[in-house]
């Protein structure tokens, strides 16, 4: 128990020429080590499929089959949504559709191409997306012609699109069908594989390789290994079972107040010390997240115990703690790591003067900043903008605004003082 301290013609080397720009807050790093072309694949069927499916870099799709209609050939998520209506709606409102937003784009204007290429491995991994980004930013190796009809011109800004996970060489892949499928399906049907229901599929982008960046001896992103070491992981409860329940393409996590609240079990106990003093103790247990709460170095969660009068007005903070792994803005030093492992309990408590009268209570509040590290980093960058273009500053300000507006607050418990 923890006591809290208070396109086809584009070659695979498209984004390899350096531009010499400065790289600021580089958090992205491709996940588990991926094979390069010509390297032997693992013998385990899941590992073998994933190694081929996520070969680095992904090759262009190539020309679509002649019999494909424009909708069947298109890489646009909107085209997929013509038939996969619910999946498209879920994706459209998810964070996966925003992985190539202002928070990434302002940095691309300062990065060299190899660094940006590393980010796009997970944020916008298709070769066609890289080509469009190169066109937009004027990078070396950008295609000289317009994209083919099956590549929408905004594909690079749509983030982790359907095709990033489900399409290779215009062939569709997905989990095994739950019910029998029709004899004739659009886009020549699909190839089922169990890898889509295995946590290793998610590890491709949610687990840094052993050679990845470490702070205080710990990988910067270690979500898959945190899960593997947890009771849910050992029991075979996959990432998809929580974050894609019933195959919904929602991927809810720390940004979602309901999902975050469900990850915790809390109790609040009051003890009378004497006629004038009382003690409150809150126990907060990570019972629902199969990884650290929170995972990664970006989010921060602040818990507070508050004295509240009969009218519901706060009358004093009794105790506060931050649950997070905090690093400095340039990611060279871990400042602290107070996160809860799966199944771990933290205790927050303090003494207070017993109020007179009835109707007083103690409330346990949770304030979540899903992008806390980004907020600090982006604010720091805004203080050093002399080398930035006007458009870069605009994107940076929008990225900061988005990070700040993602915050939320939840009352987890209310205990009446008797």
Regions found by a protein language model. Give the residues of each.
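Noncatalytic linker/hinge segments flanking ATPase motor cores
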Residues: 117-124, 202-205, 244, 320-328, ...
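Sequence context of c-type cytochrome heme-c attachment sites
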Residues: 7, 15-196, 203-204, 210-233
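Amphipathic alpha-helical interaction segments
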Residues: 99-100, 235, 259, 416
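N-terminal export/targeting leaders of redox proteins
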Residues: 1-75, 130, 248-418
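A contiguous, surface-exposed recognition patch within enzymatic or periplasmic domains that forms
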Residues: 200, 208-241, 245-265, 283
């Amino acid at each position: 128990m923890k006591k809290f301290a208070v396109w086809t013609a584009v070659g695979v080397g498209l984004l390899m020429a350096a531009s010499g720009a400065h790289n600021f807050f580089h958090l992205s790093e491709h996940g588990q080590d991926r094979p390069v072309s010509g390297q032997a694949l693992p013998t385990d069927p899941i590992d073998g499929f994933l190694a081929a499916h996520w070969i680095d870099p992904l090759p262009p799709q190539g020309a679509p089959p002649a019999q494909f209609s424009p909708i069947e050939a298109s890489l646009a998520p909107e085209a997929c949504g013509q038939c996969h209506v619910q999946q498209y709606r879920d994706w459209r409102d998810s964070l996966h559709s925003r992985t190539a937003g202002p928070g990434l784009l302002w940095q691309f204007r300062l990065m060299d191409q190899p660094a940006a290429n590393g980010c796009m491995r997970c944020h916008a991994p298709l070769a066609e997306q890289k080509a469009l980004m190169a066109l937009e930013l004027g990078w070396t190796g950008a295609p000289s012609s317009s994209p083919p009809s099956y590549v929408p011109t905004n594909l690079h800004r749509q983030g982790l699109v359907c095709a990033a996970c489900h399409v290779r060489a215009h062939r569709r892949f997905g989990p095994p069908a739950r019910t029998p499928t029709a004899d004739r399906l659009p886009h020549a049907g699909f190839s089922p594989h169990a890898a889509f229901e295995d946590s290793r599929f998610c590890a491709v982008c949610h687990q840094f390789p052993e050679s990845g960046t470490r702070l205080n001896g710990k990988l910067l992103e270690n979500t898959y290994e945190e899960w593997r070491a947890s009771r849910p992981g050992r029991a075979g409860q996959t990432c998809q079972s929580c974050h894609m329940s019933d195959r919904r393409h929602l991927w809810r996590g720390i940004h979602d107040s309901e999902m975050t609240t469900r990850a915790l079990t809390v109790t609040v106990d009051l003890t009378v010390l004497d006629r004038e003093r009382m003690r409150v103790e809150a126990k907060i247990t990570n019972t629902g997240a199969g990884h650290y709460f929170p995972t990664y170095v970006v989010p921060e969660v602040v818990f507070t115990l508050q004295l509240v009068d009969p009218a519901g007005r706060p009358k004093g903070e009794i105790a506060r703690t931050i649950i997070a792994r905090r690093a400095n803005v340039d990611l060279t030093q871990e400042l602290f790591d107070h996160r809860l492992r799966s199944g771990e309990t933290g205790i927050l408590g303090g003494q207070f003067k017993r109020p007179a009268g009835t109707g007083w209570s103690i409330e346990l509040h949770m304030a979540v900043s899903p992008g806390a590290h980004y907020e600090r980093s982006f604010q720091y960058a805004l203080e050093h903008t002399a080398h930035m273009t006007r458009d870069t500053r605009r994107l940076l300000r929008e990225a900061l605004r988005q990070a700040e507006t993602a915050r939320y607050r939840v009352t987890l418990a209310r205990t009446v003082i008797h």
